[in-house]
Regions:
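Flexible metal-binding regulatory segments at protein termini and peripheral loops
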Residues: 1-132, 144, 230, 255-256, ...
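Conserved ATP-binding TGD loop and adjacent catalytic N/P-domain core of P-type ATPases
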Residues: 17, 348, 438, 518-520, ...
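Conserved cytosolic catalytic loops of P-type ATPases
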Residues: 27-46, 53, 206-209, 238-332, ...
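Actuator/coupling domain of P-type ATPases
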Residues: 61-69, 74-76, 80-81, 135-137, ...
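Soluble-to-membrane junctions at the N-terminal ends of transmembrane alpha-helices
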Residues: 81-103, 154-177, 339-371, 388, ...
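Membrane-embedded alpha-helical bundles of multi-pass transporters
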Residues: 116-131, 160, 179, 418, ...
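Conserved catalytic phosphorylation-site environment of P-type ATPases
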Residues: 296, 355, 390, 403-477, ...
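P-type ATPase nucleotide-binding
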Residues: 456, 460-588, 600, 612-628
């Protein structure tokens, strides 16, 4: 069972490490992850072996508070509540800080002003007023200590529980300075009572009230700055929450009624007008709209929607009017799921953080030990007690476990948030880290490299067979199949007006094709392997099939009663950005491998068109996982990119599984990274983002370790004998505050992350990239065509364009366009002439 808890009282990584350690000791707990940034904890435990009450008890015994987070609370509401709590805490801290600074300014003026020649009231000057001078500092320090008493409460409480943290260091440092100063007050009183002015003067010069106050104030300043910076790390989640419309227009009792969006019920009819945000997920019942989905997918071009199309909550209807049926509300909406994914990813730990976690767990006890040793060594070496104490206090307050603890989670939080803004959902910190290790990317062809919407490109009949007969039998058989190629054949036949009947005894042979009975005839539709197995003679058609395969078509032979009737060639257009994405991957040093069930010749045609380094053809759906495993056994770190149900095992097997956004729920569930758009360039972005985040984490960890490695010896006075350097407690506390702020600010640089290809094109991608492979220049173009009315029209245009040397074309009736790949010798005029000669009008070539 997996349960999320809110945890209170944590102030640094030592706290989170102790909470994690305490809960992991509870019998039945399998895994614990504590998030210092979100003050939350996720626990996986065996139901029956333990329960939430035992876990909360363990946290309380460790000196902190915990409560179960409501699993049914919508992510948007939870995030809003977190924002309110954070804002309230920031307001209190700001109030506390303001008064602390006010008292500190007066204290510093009095304690240091006489050294700088600044004017002081007469009652604070002279030997006879030394006690007044000291007591004034005491009374100015006490309010600062009271305002910041939280450090003492948390610090000493943690110390007594055997889990000292950063608050413990601050509390011990400021208390030591305060107690020593109070002891100097007694010495002053004793000396003045005996008339020993020099002794009293020496005691007055060794007061550290301003150090005690300065430590508390500077640490609070640092905490305030750190808090504000940390809040910015979750800006992406805040933006997502703000996307959701607050109200919805629904039809109740036949009337339009405006209600809060969270009160919409499943099955209700929701009205969406131009310019309005869509409040929930659902399906359009009537009307049309132009929907801006950029907030969810990152795609800037609005999408036309009509009856039957799905729409997503938090997207915006830019134009049009429609009514929709709500089918996903509250925590089930796409937006809520995205928020939950981003939160969970930000709260997860990357393996690179393990060293920092180990160090954080023992850091504070080690620092306290070093501080005690520092005082003892200086006293034994003959230094004054005030010098030794100042060095010990400096060690306590300069040490910063927070920098270590924040190094990884801040970078992961900002990185996953930045990914979400670009339509890339990263499920965990481990996935984010692992992606930077990838050296091989395996791409499923259909729906990943290609559009996933095949269309019939050519029909060839055997002698004595009509096209209508061939299409009728093929479509009747394929209608029982759910394969994309089958859908293309059925659609083509229906558009041609061919009668489609019902097939019986339907059977599918994996990797070969399908068979069944149509109008009393045994019909086969499949590849050459199926024809050979069924002993169907190809009558020389295999030569033409080979030519079509070399052009990137997938060829299906159609036979009836063991006699070949003809063949149908189907083409799946390559996505416009696939070539550029593959080129970018290769430039990043990644090996690109394409998996496809197509014939070898078809696969080689796609390989040549896109410049893919390696192709594995005729792969059965169940064998994709085996191919990924084989690559891993060769020593490769493999990322698998796919969108189908049969991709799920391969996605799970890969080091990183990437589900492309148009894919199935099963594929998305199996993946580590989900791309909301069906764009391969987002794979490039995901890998580059991973590399940027890991680089940022390494910078943070390097800073945190180096800061403590240099700062602690400096504070202890190691360099004093040689260079006469001694760090005062005030500078130590300032340095500690700066250290945490530096780490958070460095992580915030990731908010400006842009993938390399966007930088090249000024923040935009090239929609139709040109490519140069092995000295041969090829270009991909889109020809907009008017006048095509049916599948016969597309066939004529297809034939006209493919008759040109150096041209490979796929024609889409739905898009009223032809997608062509041409070599540099073919001009736009030649393309236009071919279409016009076929009897159609060209409205544009892109």
């Amino acid at each position: 069972m997996k349960q999320k808890f809110d945890v209170t009282g944590m102030s640094c990584s030592a706290c989170s490490a102790h909470v994690e350690k305490a809960v992991s000791r509870v019998p039945g707990v399998d895994q614990v992850q504590v998030n210092l940034l979100q003050n939350s904890m996720v626990v996986e435990y065996e139901d029956g072996a333990t329960d939430a009450a035992a876990i909360i008890h363990a946290v309380e015994d460790a000196g902190y508070g915990a409560s179960v987070k409501d699993a049914h609370e919508p992510a948007k509401k939870a995030e809003n509540d977190l924002q309110k709590r954070t804002a309230e805490e920031a307001k209190k801290m700001k109030h506390r800080l303001g008064w602390s600074i006010a008292f500190l300014i007066v204290l510093m003026y009095i304690s240091m002003g006489h050294m700088l020649g600044w004017p002081l009231p007469g009652i604070l000057l002279g030997h006879e007023n030394m006690m007044t001078f000291a007591l004034t500092q005491l009374f100015l320090t006490l309010p600062i200590m009271y305002l910041n008493r939280k450090y003492y409460e948390n610090g000493f409480k943690s110390l007594f529980h055997g889990a000292p943290n950063m608050d413990t260091l601050v509390a011990m440092g400021s208390t030591a300075a305060f107690v020593y100063s109070v002891s100097r007050l007694y010495v002053m009183g004793y000396a003045m009572g005996r008339g020993e002015t020099d002794m009293a003067h020496m005691a007055a010069m060794n007061l550290y009230f301003e150090s005690a106050a300065m430590i508390l104030t500077l640490v609070t300043i640092g905490k305030y700055m750190e808090s504000r910076s940390k809040n910015r790390t979750s800006d992406a989640i805040t933006k997502l929450v703000d996307l959701a419309p607050k109200t919805a227009l629904v039809v109740r009792n036949g009337r339009e009624t405006e209600i809060p969006a969270d009160q919409v019920q499943v099955g209700e009819t929701v009205i969406v007008k131009p310019g309005q945000g869509i409040p929930v997920d659902g399906v359009i019942l009537e009307g049309t709209g132009t929907v801006d989905e950029s907030a969810i997918t990152g795609e800037s071009i609005p999408v036309e929607k009509k009856a039957g199309d799905r729409v997503t909550g938090a997207t915006v209807n830019r134009a049009g009017y429609f009514q929709m049926k709500a089918d996903r509300i509250g925590e089930d909406t796409t937006l809520s799921q995205i928020i939950r994914l981003v939160e969970e990813a930000g709260g997860s730990k990357a393996p690179i953080a393990k060293l920092a976690d180990k160090v954080s767990g023992i850091f504070v006890p080690v620092v306290i030990t070093i501080a005690v040793i520092t005082i003892i060594v200086w006293l034994l070496s003959g230094a004054t007690f005030s010098f030794a104490l100042a060095s010990g206090i400096a060690v306590l307050v300069i040490s910063c476990p927070c920098a270590l603890g924040l190094a990884t989670p801040t970078a992961i939080m900002v990185g996953t948030g930045r990914g979400a803004e670009q339509g890339i959902l990263i499920k965990s910190g481990e996935s984010l880290e692992t992606a930077h290790l990838v050296d091989t990317v395996v791409l499923d062809k259909t729906g990943t490299i290609t559009e996933g919407h095949p269309a019939v490109a050519a029909v060839r009949t055997a002698p004595g067979v009509t096209e209508a007969e061939l299409l009728g039998l093929a479509a009747s058989l394929e209608k029982a199949s759910e394969h994309p190629l089958a859908e293309a054949i059925v659609r083509y036949a229906e558009e041609a007006g061919v009668e489609v009947s019902q097939a019986t005894e339907f059977a599918a042979e994996a990797g070969q094709g399908v068979s069944g009975m149509v109008s009393g005839r045994k019909v086969l539709a499949g590849n050459q392997k199926m024809m050979d197995a069924q002993k169907v003679t190809l009558d020389g058609m295999d030569a033409e099939a080979g030519k079509l395969s070399e052009e990137g078509r997938t060829v299906l032979y159609i036979a009836a009663d063991q006699k070949l009737l003809g063949m149908i060639a189907v083409a799946d257009p390559v996505k416009k950005t696939s070539a550029e994405a593959i080129r970018e991957m290769e430039q990043m040093g990644l090996d690109v491998v394409m998996l496809t069930g197509d014939h070898e010749k078809t696969a080689r045609a796609i390989q040549k068109q896109l410049g893919i380094s390696r192709v594995i053809a005729q792969v059965l759906p169940q064998d994709k996982e085996r191919e990924v495993r084989r690559l891993q056994e060769e020593g490769h770190k493999v990322a698998m990119v796919g969108d189908g149900i049969n991709d799920a095992p391969a996605l799970a097997r890969a080091v990183v599984g990437i589900a492309i956004g148009a894919g199935t729920d099963v594929a998305i569930e199996s993946a580590d990274i989900v791309l909301m758009k069906s764009d391969l360039l987002d794979v490039v972005t995901a890998v580059q983002l991973s590399r940027a985040v890991i680089r940022n984490i390494k910078e943070n960890l390097f800073w945190a370790f180096c800061y403590n490695a240099i700062g602690i010896p400096l504070a202890a006075g190691v360099f004093y004998p040689l260079l006469n350097w001694q760090l005062s407690p005030m500078f130590g506390s300032a340095a500690m505050s700066f250290s945490s702020v530096f780490v958070v600010c460095n992580a915030l640089r990731l908010k400006g992350f842009q993938p390399g290809f966007r930088k090249k094109h000024g923040g935009k991608t090239t929609a139709v990239p040109a490519e140069e492979k092995k000295g041969e220049l090829t270009m991909k173009k889109t020809i907009k065509i008017e006048g095509m009315m049916c599948s016969h029209c597309t066939g004529r245009v297809d034939k006209a364009l493919n008759a040109l040397d150096g041209v490979t074309a796929t024609v889409s009736l739905e898009d009223k366009a032809a997608y062509v790949t041409v070599d540099g010798a073919v001009t736009d005029e030649e393309l236009k002439k071919a279409v016009v000669d076929a009897g159609y009008e060209v409205t544009g070539i892109e």
